[in-house]
Amino acid sequence: MALPYDPDSWPANWILQLIAKDRLKEFYLSTHWKRFRLRLLKSRPCRCQLCEQKEPAVLTPLRKPWEKKSDSNDRRPVAIVHHINEVRHRPDLALSEYDEHGEPNTIIVCPGCHWDEHHKRKIPVTEERW
């Protein structure tokens, strides 16, 4: 279980410095992230957790990044590890499977659901009157 948020802890301090320099991509290229991501992908089923929650449930089989396509008809998308608590908002949880309440901080998703999570349509502040 993670401890309460501490911006002076590692990796939070390092990630905040990267964000300030607009170089957050360096975190995702780091050995720390690659090892963490690899461990998660090896230990969890390779299915989109968000597709499974849809009604009706959709089982989206995913390909692990190191797997080659089995043939030219292999259309499985590559699995993505998604942070539920965005790294920009909770850098202390960047390398944690769970948050301080024991809730999952990372999930395996397909590229479509990952895009949807990062580009959610914002709810308008005022009611649309068209």
Please describe what each predicted stretch is.
Residues 53-57, 103-128:
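Short Cys/His-centered divalent metal-binding micro-motifs
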Residues 88-91, 117-119:
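Activation segment
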Residues 48, 91-113:
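Short beta-strand-alpha-helix junction that forms the catalytic/metal-binding core
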